[in-house]
């Protein structure tokens, strides 16, 4: 660890002149003696003005000002400023012309030569850059700090890390020796520290550089890049924004910010400032390819490589794309292209691995991450990529080893740290196994959830194996997290994952515990299990739209009440022309700007799958799945299965949608808001009608909605709103009329509140319990996320002796919330009346975990259940625990006597 001498600013300023003079004496480069008259005030003013214009992003004006400096004494400074102004606008040839004289005698003009070398690197001439910097270093006793660091970066790029480290260490030694004072040089020392894996030092040095000069845009952005490299987006964003407050056209800051927020807007701004900014072009290209917009992405990458043929990120993106398509000839061509200037580049392989992992190609990602580590065992990013992808393949032990190795050497990487912390969480979890599954969940969930999840998993397995004719690799690993943050970190490495509630990686599934949800957890499990099948069937090659579309379509196949019914959203999307072409469906996921957009992407994908199932049949859907197991163009796959090209298929889908909208035949007002909910359909979606009723005067709202239904009798939302308003006014007859009309218009509506739910409330207010229960039952035909309604119906069915009905509604309630004691009391009573002693035991065991209000009664009930199920030893031990607390409890004493009688009789 290098010593950091954070000398106070005042001391630094006091020492600057003396040390600078000493440095000049030591340097092999000395300025010619100039007479006092040579200090041309007008030239200095021009330099200051040019610097100010550069700082504020007025690059063309800066070019004009710097071009007016004609004093030889300031020539190097003017050319540095002029070249930078040209470079900031992508005028690399003009910048090179300005700097060209440094190429002849680089040691005499070290700053110019260093800037020229940086330009060579930007334009894909690292060999020339290496030679130029070598000449400066060899020709100078004390070459500039920037020269040392840039030389190290070039040597690193060209694969000579050991030689690079020599120059990075020289830069740090210069700082430790008290010979670095300027903000720009301190920032370069920070870069050297970062390259030497001294991340704490790098952070402190960047901080010092910015403290010395708050306008050092380069330092602000390089510091932000360090944060972003460690997945600390919050601090990175702060740095980029600080730079942009000074210069809103500073392209490096815009590119950095684009990786965090508003990517297309910020990248477009960067390219407006510099249309030849390779980082912006490469980032845009990678984003487009990741979103399935290959032609656009390839165009950006070609532009980047035309400017810098040695851009490893651009070449790695193209190579990763080739690997995903199994085009190994193209991959090898790209690899050899990289090898020509950076033999077996570790960063090249690590970038490929990261790209593949982000596209769910975990097996291939592991392969390339290993190659990166073989080339450079110090590439801690590659260790993190390898560890994360191994975990997603279920290879947790080896994955953890690589994550630990990365963390030990780079403890500031938030992603690595987060993933390791989840291992600590999992160590406290129970590990449960069934025939085909290995499940990690909290001790609480192991007692409450597992008894209901295990049979669901195995039953679902049998059904899906029979349906798809495929058996996934076992065991399938399922991890159920109590904390949303742990679920997010295990899934993507960072604690913010939005409203997702489950993720499948093919062999591993992560879920949020139902204890933190208000949704049907069984539907979620089924949805994710379908992913296990389709992803493994296609070796994780299936696009997201089809994978999500099939899983969403299968929801309704799993249970009649499951699935998404978004008729209003469909009509609204058609009205707004929001339906994407089938070939661009992945854009709906990657380009979503809100949860509502993402929810609709799921819904449209489901509609395409439903169209296939209805128009072509399940066998053709299965054939399409198998097509994705091979590497073909998507249009060829569709032609093979459906006998039509993508355009014809899309036209057929749109005609089907138009007919579906016509069949729904409901008016949707432009002012109505779409239903909103969390979990991308896995949960209640709230209708704005209830909110409107709270916000607005009943009479004015009623008159407005009456006007709407008079103009458009099939205005579902207006009828529903009128029903709510009239119910609040206790005008029950009129409320019922409008609510029944709303239900008839859209009988499968699942938003909250639905017409049937409000009708149930109306009948409850009228004292008509039978009609109330009838409406609750109607609501539950299409609403899988409600707990109160099935509970009420189960209690009534139990009271009147309709045990099958009671059992159905008990299961419906358990599917939403197995953590409420009352459902287990009803379940225990039901099981007892059905003579199912084993189920009675289960319900009382769970109830004992949940109900801490009266543990004596809970243990006594459980003891009786054990006794009835021929488990006298368990009954005796349980009732003794009850008697420890209440030794005179007569019922417990009687159960104890019954429990010990058989053993005494023996």
What is each of the regions a protein language model found here?
Residues 57-61, 89-98, 124-132, 159-170, ...:
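Structural signature of tandem alpha-helical TPR/SEL1-like repeats
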Residues 81, 115, 150, 185-188, ...:
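Canonical tetratricopeptide repeat
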């Amino acid at each position: 660890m290098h010593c950091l001498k954070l000398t106070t600013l005042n001391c630094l300023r006091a020492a600057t002149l003396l040390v600078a003079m000493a440095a000049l004496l030591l340097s092999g480069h000395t300025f010619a003696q100039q007479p006092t008259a040579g200090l041309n005030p007008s030239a200095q003013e021009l330099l200051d003005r040019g610097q100010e214009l550069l700082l504020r992003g007025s690059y063309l004006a800066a070019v004009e000002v710097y071009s007016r400096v004609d004093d030889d004494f300031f020539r190097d400074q003017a050319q540095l400023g002029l070249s930078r102004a040209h470079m900031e606008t992508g005028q690399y040839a003009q910048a090179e012309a300005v700097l060209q004289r440094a190429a002849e005698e680089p040691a005499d003009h070290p700053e110019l030569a260093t800037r020229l070398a940086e330009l060579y690197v930007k334009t894909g001439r690292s060999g020339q850059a290496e030679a130029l910097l070598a000449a400066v270093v060899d020709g100078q006793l004390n070459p500039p700090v920037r020269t040392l660091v840039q030389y190290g970066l070039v040597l690193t790029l060209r694969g000579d890390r050991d030689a690079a480290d020599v120059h990075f260490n020289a830069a740090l030694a210069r700082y430790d020796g008290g010979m670095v004072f300027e903000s720009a040089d301190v920032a370069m020392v920070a870069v050297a520290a970062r390259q030497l894996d001294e991340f704490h030092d790098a952070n402190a040095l960047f901080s010092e550089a910015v403290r010395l000069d708050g306008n050092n845009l380069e330092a602000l952005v390089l510091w932000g890049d360090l944060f972003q490299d460690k997945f600390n987006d919050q601090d990175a964003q702060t740095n980029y924004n600080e730079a942009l407050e000074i210069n809103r056209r500073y392209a490096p800051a815009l590119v950095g910010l684009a990786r965090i927020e508003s990517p297309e807007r910020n990248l477009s701004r960067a390219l407006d400032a510099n249309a030849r900014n390779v980082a912006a072009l490469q980032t845009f290209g990678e984003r487009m390819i990741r979103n399935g917009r290959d032609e656009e992405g390839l165009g950006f990458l070609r532009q980047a490589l035309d400017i810098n043929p040695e851009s490893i990120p651009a070449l790695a993106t193209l190579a990763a794309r080739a690997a995903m398509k199994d085009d190994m000839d193209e991959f090898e061509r790209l690899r050899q292209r990289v090898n020509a200037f950076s033999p077996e580049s570790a960063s090249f392989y690590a970038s490929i691995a990261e790209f593949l992992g982000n596209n769910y190609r975990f097996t291939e990602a592991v392969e390339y991450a290993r190659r990166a580590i073989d080339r450079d065992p110090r590439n801690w990013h590659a260790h993190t990529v390898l560890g994360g992808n191994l975990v997603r393949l279920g290879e947790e032990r080896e994955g953890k080893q690589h994550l630990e190795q990365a963390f030990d050497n780079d403890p500031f990487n938030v992603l690595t740290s987060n993933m390791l912390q989840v291992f600590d969480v999992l160590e406290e979890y129970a590990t449960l196994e069934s025939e085909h599954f290995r499940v990690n969940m909290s001790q609480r969930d192991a007692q409450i959830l597992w008894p209901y999840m295990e049979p669901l998993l195995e039953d679902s397995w049998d059904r899906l194996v029979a349906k798809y004719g495929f058996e996934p690799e076992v065991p399938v690993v399922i991890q159920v997290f109590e904390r949303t943050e742990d679920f997010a970190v295990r899934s993507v490495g960072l604690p913010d994952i939005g409203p997702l509630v489950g993720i499948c990686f093919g062999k591993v599934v992560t879920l949020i515990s139902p204890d933190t949800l208000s949704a049907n957890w069984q539907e979620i499990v089924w949805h994710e299990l379908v992913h296990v099948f389709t992803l493994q069937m296609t070796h994780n090659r299936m696009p997201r739209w089809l994978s999500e579309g099939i899983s969403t379509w299968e929801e309704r196949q799993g249970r009649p009440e499951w699935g998404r019914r978004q008729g209003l959203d469909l009509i609204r999307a058609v009205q707004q022309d929001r339906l994407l072409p089938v070939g661009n469906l992945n854009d709906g996921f990657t380009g979503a700007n809100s949860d509502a957009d993402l929810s609709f992407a799921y819904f449209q994908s489901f509609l395409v799958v439903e169209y296939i199932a209805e128009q072509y049949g399940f066998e053709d859907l299965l054939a399409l799945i198998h097509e994705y197991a091979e590497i073909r163009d998507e249009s060829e796959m569709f032609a093979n299965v459906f006998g039509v090209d993508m355009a014809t298929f899309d036209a057929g889908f749109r005609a089907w949608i138009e007919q579906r909208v016509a069949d729904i035949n409901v008016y949707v007002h432009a002012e109505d808001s779409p239903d909103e909910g969390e979990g991308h359909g896995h949960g209640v979606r709230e209708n704005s009608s209830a909110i409107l009723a709270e916000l607005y005067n009943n009479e004015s709202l009623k008159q407005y909605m009456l006007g709407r239904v008079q103009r458009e009798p099939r205005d579902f939302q207006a009828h529903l709103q009128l029903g709510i308003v009239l119910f609040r006014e206790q005008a029950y007859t009129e409320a019922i009329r409008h609510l029944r009309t709303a239900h008839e218009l859209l009988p499968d509506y699942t938003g909250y509140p639905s017409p049937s739910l409000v009708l149930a409330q109306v009948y409850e207010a009228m004292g008509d319990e039978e009609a109330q229960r009838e409406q609750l039952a109607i609501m539950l035909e299409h609403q899988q996320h409600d707990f109160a309604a099935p509970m009420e119906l189960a209690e009534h069915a139990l009271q009147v002796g309709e045990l099958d009905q009671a059992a159905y509604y008990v299961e419906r309630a358990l599917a939403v919330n197995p953590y409420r004691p009352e459902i287990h009391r009803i379940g225990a009573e039901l099981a007892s009346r059905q003579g199912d002693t084993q189920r009675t035991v289960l319900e009382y065991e769970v109830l004992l975990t949940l109900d801490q209000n009266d543990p004596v009664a809970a243990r006594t009930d459980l003891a009786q259940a054990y006794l009835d199920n021929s488990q006298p030893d368990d009954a005796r031990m349980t009732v003794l625990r009850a008697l420890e607390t209440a030794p005179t409890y007569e019922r417990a004493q009687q159960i104890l006597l019954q429990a010990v009688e058989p053993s005494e009789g023996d």
